[in-house]
C-alpha cells in the first residue's frame, strides 16, 4: 500500500525517484516523488 512505499523506496539526493514512482503506481496512485529524501505518493 501507499505507506509502505515510504519505507521501501529509497530516494537519492538528486531527484532519482523511479522506485518511489513505481511503488506508488502499483499502489494505485498516479505518481510518486521525493520530498526530503522520503517517498511521497500523489493521489
Curated annotation (Swiss-Prot):
Gene Ontology molecular-function annotations? potassium channel inhibitor activity; toxin activity
Can you say where in the cell this protein is located? Secreted
Expression by tissue:
Expressed by the venom gland.
Q: Which GO terms describe its cellular component?
A: extracellular region
Disulfides per UniProt? 5-23, 11-34, 20-39, 24-41
Q: Its domain of life?
A: Eukaryota
Q: Which Gene3D superfamilies match?
A: Knottin, scorpion toxin-like
Alphabetically sorted, this entry's keywords are: Disulfide bond, Ion channel impairing toxin, Knottin, Neurotoxin, Potassium channel impairing toxin, Secreted, Toxin, Voltage-gated potassium channel impairing toxin
UniProt cross-references to SUPFAM superfamilies, sorted A to Z: Scorpion toxin-like
One of this protein's Pfam families, by short name? Toxin_17
> Quick one: signal sequence residues?
none
Under the heading InterPro entries, the entry gives: Ergtoxin (IPR012622), Scorpion_toxin-like_sf (IPR036574)
What this chain does, per the entry, is described as: Reversibly blocks Kv11/ERG potassium channels.
Please give the family membership noted in the entry: Belongs to the ergtoxin family. Gamma-KTx 4 subfamily.
Q: What is known of its domains?
A: The presence of a 'disulfide through disulfide knot' structurally defines this protein as a knottin. Has the CSalpha/beta fold, which comprises one or two short alpha helices connected to anti-parallel beta-sheets stabilized by three or four disulfide bonds.
User: What name appears for this protein in its UniProt entry?
Assistant: Potassium channel toxin gamma-KTx 4.7
Q: Which species expresses this protein natively?
A: Centruroides limpidus
The beginning of the lineage is: Eukaryota, Metazoa, Ecdysozoa, Arthropoda, Chelicerata
